[in-house]
Amino acid sequence: MSSSPFTNLGNLDTEAIYENKENEYQTNITNETSNVQNLSSGNDDQQYPNSTNDDANNGLTASQAKLQDIAAVTLFQDNNISTTTLAPPSPSPLRLNEAPRRRGRPRKYPPKPIDEGSEPIIKRKRGRPPKIKSSSPSTKLDDPLKPKRGRGRPRLHPLPVVQPSVDEGTTQNNLQMGLDEPNIIEGFAEGHANLSELKPKRGRGRPRKIKPEEGSSSQNGLSPLVVLPAKRGRGRPPLHRSEQKIANTPISNNVTVESTGTNLHTHSQLNPENEQSSSEFYSLNPQSEIRKEVVVTDQPLFSTADVPVKRKRGRPPLNKPKILFGTSTENKIDENRPKRGRGRPRLERPSGLPLDSKSQSLFKRKRGRPPKIASGIVPLSAFTRKHEDMLHDSDALSLKHFAITSPNNQQFLNNQQRESAPLLPRKRGRPPKKRQENAEIRNITPGLTDSSVHSSSATPQSESSSPNSVSPLLPSSDRLPLLRQSQFTPPPKKPNFEVAIISPKKSQHKLYPNPVVESVFNDVPYSEIDSQLHTIKSTIAARLCGKSHIPLVGHMDEQTKLYQWVRQTIVLGEGNSVIIVGPRGSGKSVLVDDILSRAAQEINEKSYVVRLNGTYQTDDKLALREISRQLSIELESIESDEALKSEMNFSDTLTKLLATLSHPVDLGIAEDVMTTSAAVIFVLEEFDLFVQHSRQMLLYNLFDIAQSRKAPILIIGLTTRYDCSESLEKRVKSRFSHMVIPMRPPSSLSEFEQILKSVLYVSDEGGKDQIITCWNQRVDELLSDTRSHLHKLVQHHYFASRNLKLLYVDLLFPILSMAPDRPLLADEDFANISLKVSDHKVELVKNLSLLELALLICAVRFEARDIPACNFNSAYQEYRQLHQSSVINAAASGALAHSSRLWGRDVALEAWETLGSIGLIIPVHPSTNVSGALSRQCQLWQPEVDINVVSVGLREHRRLPSHYYRWLKEVI
């Protein structure tokens, strides 16, 4: 049998053996772990150099063989220990009681040994520690008078300790019987098992006020406990709240409590010996600041000791009787006194006046206006010689002559004692005017006439001679009462002595024709006057409507430049292009018409004029069709129509149309270089709209023909935009001649009137026609007079817009309304210009919403800046800028809020299309098909109304913000 290290361990302690075994086991594990780490690092062959071939044959490495050896040694040692003959050691109680090791951080301190007699310690849980419950029977019961400690914040002021008091007689009896006071209290606590119910459980929050229980202290001769005030409820406190708490009284005592006001009276029917004890029986609250007096009286009263009910909110009911405790004769209410009602307080009746029906009617307050107090005015018939002294002293007039109240007419006549004051009640309405001191005084008798009044006032007479007359010796003092008429004479509507003051009217200036001029028409027959008047009316109406030429006034430099370029084109065959820029009404079209008419008279060469308008020719195809139509009329041929119908491109079609007008040398017709073909002058009105055409094909071909030697043409563009030349494409701009003529509007009122004279004047070739001469003189007379209505009308248009076309519209109706019986202009015809039929566009403008009106103002602002067309995007951007500037101005002026809001883009787009549907704005390209939101926003529109129509609509608009006027005035 092989020797083992565990064979001679019989005398050793088993615990030491197990400890040594555990230490060796831990040491071996540590060493083997380090060896395994060394083997993994590559030192297996050095530590096991003599590895057998069997291991190699089995496919095991040196490290794996070493691990097998360690496992075999460990298994062998365990088998030896388990098969030893030694008795197994008894397990240690420390190991048996030790709880299994859990995962986590190792224990810092080993567990303490547990005593055999002690109870196992329960593991402490999180949260509030549990209360320790003691099971010892020696624990005494808690004091029932001590409240239970509750949760929450500790009480700020501890409750007072209640000590029951014992009467003196009871104490002496207890002492004689050998009982002391603590035993009595202990017996009292044992006899009252439910005494703890007096102290409610202490709850969370604010400490509860303790309320006494009924009948808890009325026995055993104990005095009542100290009573704390009741818990203060929420809301408004009651109107009359007694702050004194009274304990229940014994049944044998008759107690009456009278609660009147703020005092508390207690009446008790007690013996004198018990008065002191009864007064001590009621204890006051020590915490109350104000204590009420307790008055004890011996007078017995018949009442009960009811506690007053808590007063409810609101007005007390009317049908509920008033409860009085301890009533007496002094507090009795008069039953005859009427019930107090709502409204104005009742007028008190004097004490000395008897209460009868007459006095009640006298002092009863009625509804409505109070009655008029009787006036001290005395009729004239009551005055005699003996009353003259009384008139000088107002104090001598006693009130006994006048009525106390205002009776009706029948009572007034039946009262014989008040004949001296026959006055009627004051009527409603405006009081009569104060009569003058020196005014004539009429007699109240119906028999007196106006003549007698004048005679009596002029010559004084005695009373006997004229009893019905007025005494002239009446005093002129201010204290003299005014006289009134009696009930028999109706009052006059207006006194004769009152004079109506009327301010004189200003003489209206009227301009009548000169009588010398009128005498001329007397010698002329009616038929001749009618024919001459018809000629004058047709000539001036054609000028006002733009159908005939108007003579140009001023602009001499502009006329010289344009005439020179026209002459070079017609005579020398040069091609040029020029743009005339200026605001509306400045005379651009008049300048072109004047130069063309002058060239037609002075130049013998043949030329043609083609007029195009960007408002009507919205695309190049329509413009080409209009050119072909006008040239075919001028040339009287059909080649233009055939060329238009052929399938050719735009440039070839335009070249073929102008082929007949090309240079003769190019066509091979003539060999003379000085010979030229007929010139063509293109007048393009609204030139900026042609610039907006796609690719600008029309302008490119016209400028290209003008720069080349194909045909002598002159392109004259009329526009209101000063930046129109900058909008040209690069290829079009390179072929433009860059010649611009600016035009300015009339700069003075005299120049404005001079232009109007040139329109209203009718030319007389020989000066032999007297009717035309009188017409021109009448025009000069009306325009030169500053008081005439025609001159005022011209001033209005000059300072408002300086637009002659608007003035022409106002002059058209008075001129066409002339007749042969009145062949000259009348100034009254121009005074009723404001009474003409209102424009329907003004009605449309004043019925617009605020958003629609704002967008229309933005479109008009663009037109005032010489931008006749705009789209929705530009109008909405202008609207946003105006709104932001208004908000900034309002904030700078100290306003808290702005009066209008900024509308969104979608809502504004609908409002913009509404303006187009009602005709206030019209599209520039009506023939194009608009589709999609982007096309709707980018489509060009131009306003159909001018700034004057919008300003009139703003004045008639209701509830319009002030900044809308400012937006419009910024461009005027």
Curated annotation (Swiss-Prot):
Xref: InterPro entries: AAA+_ATPase (IPR003593), AAA_16 (IPR041664), AT_hook_DNA-bd_motif (IPR017956), ORC4 (IPR016527), ORC4_C (IPR032705), P-loop_NTPase (IPR027417)
Bias-annotated ranges (Low complexity): 455-477
Record-level Gene Ontology MF annotations: ATP binding; ATP hydrolysis activity; DNA replication origin binding; protein-macromolecule adaptor activity
Biased composition (Basic residues): 147-156
Renumbered residue ranges of the record's region Disordered: 31-59, 82-172, 193-223, 310-374, 408-477
Phosphothreonine carried by residues: 405
CDD domains in the cross-refs: AAA
Binding partners and assembly: ORC is composed of six subunits. ORC interacts with cdc18, recruiting it to the ars1 origin of replication.
Protein name: Origin recognition complex subunit 4
Organism: Schizosaccharomyces pombe (strain 972 / ATCC 24843) (Fission yeast)
Gene: orc4
